[in-house]
Amino acid sequence: MSSKRYKKLPEKTKELTADIIEKLIPKLKKNCTTKFNESLDLSIQINNKQKKSEINLRTIVNLPAGSGKKIKVAVVCEEGKSQIAKDAGADVVGADDFIEKIKSGELNFEKLICTPSMMIKLSKLGKILGPKGLMPNPKLGTVTDDLKKAVLNAKSGQAEIKNDKDGNIGLSLGKKSFTEDKIVQNFKAVLDTLEREKSNQPIKGDLIKSVFLTSTMGVSYKLKIPKNI
């Protein structure tokens, strides 16, 4: 970040009173003074340290307005299902031959989808795919026989919700070029997903402790959520 541009950004925004997203979006966009289309990102802290257990969330949210990113999707499936994946928009499709390429280190994709029957073979590559977050997972909808749905969802815009050991979750709501309505739609989808996840967890009190909204090269603002989750 250039020092000139940084000096022009507002200071101590994290200390300001939390505000609703509709009021923060214009402020955030005003601070997006770089030449590229910056991402508008959420930083969420959850109450994951419970007395009798530790909460670890891992799920996906389908962003109704999309993510603004072009995702390269790969599919491992039986030959008889390959055309379905291709027609849905998969960039790379293969079976045993593709698994061998992955084994040799060819990871030219950002999302990997696999059918249950092929997962037995693919699971042996956990040391390659796991550290990069590419291993398909039934909870994330990436181990499935419904390849059309999985590919379309991945292409249209999904975000993974996963907290670290300190309860932090980071994800993008879209781009600076998005309209306010699109950003709000995606934000509400994230809240709805977290609310559903909370109902499946042994949590006492609120799940969400704090939420901040920022841009790629900007500053953070504390976000007020419309309801306790």
Residue ranges and their predicted role:
Residues 36-40, 197-210:
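Flexible, glycine/charged-enriched surface loops at secondary-structure junctions
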Residues 46, 77, 116, 173-175, ...:
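Flexible glycine-/small-residue-rich
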Residues 84-91:
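Glycine-rich phosphate-binding loops that contact phosphosugars or nucleotide phosphates
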Residues 91-197:
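Long, charge-patterned amphipathic alpha-helical coiled-coil/hairpin "stalk" segments used as oligomerization
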Residues 22, 26-83:
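Translation machinery proteins
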Residues 24, 85, 130, 213:
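Residue-level signature of catalytic and energy-coupling elements of molecular machines
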Residues 1-14, 21:
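Generic N-terminal amphipathic, Lys/Arg-enriched alpha-helix
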